[in-house]
Amino acid sequence: MATIALFCEGASEIKILTYIIAKYLGDDISVNALQPEMSFGRQTSPGGWYEVLRHCNNEDFNNALATNDYLIIQIDTDSCSQIGFDVNEYDENGHRVNDELLYNRVVTRLLRDLSPELLDEYCGRILFAVCINETECWLLPFYYEKENPDKCAATNNCIHHLNRKLSRDRLGIPEKDKNS
């Protein structure tokens, strides 16, 4: 059985990635959420982009990949320009860069504090789930694909679009504590 470790921003991202992994790779996969820590489906340690970056170091990578076949690092880009994240989402002319360039800048940032030796050792075992803006954007195609295909391409205010759709079915995601 293959094993996949996760470094994610929060419990909702872990749930989404676990679902996607199971959907595409089947039941012969074991997912181990290492960041944030989880107990009985609830988040028990701090989350957010800062915690993901804090785990992007040689020791945490070694620990994760010593006992797992792969490591997926999930991070949203909605806070990438904040101090500490330090990824510029604009070019030298002040225009927002395209999604591919933003993705590459974020991956470079995630790997910044790792030694070249470690990167060589684990080449091919580190995967990235960089969410352009918010993870909730990944869910829009599941709900809007048939009735409003333009919503599927949204990258801003995704939680609001998703909640609007879910509220029609009397569901919703809490905006202040989406990890509950």
Q: Predicted regions span which residues?
A:
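Extreme N-terminal starter segment of soluble prokaryotic enzymes
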Residues: 1-5
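Helix N-cap/beta->alpha junction signal
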Residues: 9-10
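Start-of-domain marker
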Residues: 42-46
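C-terminal accessory helical subdomains adjacent to catalytic cores in phosphodiester-
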Residues: 14-36, 40, 50-180
